[in-house]
C-alpha cells in the first residue's frame, strides 16, 4: 500500500517550508494577515478530552513511585524499553517511516514498527501519523496542532487536552492518514491501543516476580512502564515545543523550527528539527558532523541486514556541511 507523503501531496509539507539548495532568507509573512491564535474557549468548545487527560495523569502519578521501588532490573527494563519504543518505535517507525516514507521495508516490519511505536504511550500509529502530517502542512501557522506560537505549554502538553468529536477524528484520519486508516492491520492496532499497554504491564510484572518476587515485579512495572512513559512523553513533547523555541538553524524555513542539541540526544536525533523541517522525507536528521542521529544508525544497520531499502538520503553536502539537493 502506498504511503501519502508531501512528495505526493504538497499540502502535507506546505510550499513555504520547502528548503532551497542553500539556506535563504525566509519568505516574509503577509503583514495584513497576522497569525490568529484561537482563544481557549474555542479550543475547548467540545469540553475536555478526559480519557486522554486521565491516561496522561495516571502515567505521571505512577512515575512518582519510582524512588520507592528501585531495582537494577527495573532500571534496565526502563532503559531498554525507552530505546526500543522511543528510537525504534517512534522516531524510526512512526515518524521517519510511516509519516514521511523515508525508506521502504517489508510489510511485517511495517506492522512491527507501528506496534512498537504505539507502546510509547503517544497514541495509535494512525493518530500519531495523521497529527504529524498536519503539523508539517501548517507548521507554526493557525492550523498547526501544537505550535509554541499559541504558547509554550500549549505546544508541550495542553494541546492534548481538548475533546475532539468522532467526526473531527475521522476527518483528521481521512485527510492526513488515509493510507493507515484504510489498512485493516493499522486500524486493529488503533482500536487496541490501550490493550497492548496492559499486556506489556502484566508481562513485566510476571517477569519481575520470576526474577525477585513482588518487590521486583512492582519495580519493573513502575520503572519499565510509568517512569519510562513519562520521560518518553516529555522528550517527544520537547520536540513539539522546545525545538520551535530555542536553538540554532541550518536552514531558513518560514516556520520557527530549530536544532537543539539536548533534544537531539534524548530523542535519538529528532532534536535536529530545523534540518527535518527543511527536508522532511530525509531519513537522516543530522546534517552536520556533530549532529549525532542514533536513529539514522539504526536504519543503516537495518539496511545492512536487508530490512530497509530505497532510503531517502542526501545526495551530497556543501562545504559548510549543509545538505545540497
PLM segments and residue spans:
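Non-catalytic, topology-defining segments of multipass membrane proteins
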Residues: 1-237, 282-325
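C-terminal accessory segments of proteins
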Residues: 232-250
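Catalytic glutamate of the conserved HExxH
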Residues: 83, 96, 241, 245, ...
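Pore-loop/selectivity-filter region of tetrameric P-loop cation channels
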Residues: 87, 96, 122, 264-275
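Active-site-proximal inter-transmembrane loops
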Residues: 176-185, 246-272, 278-279
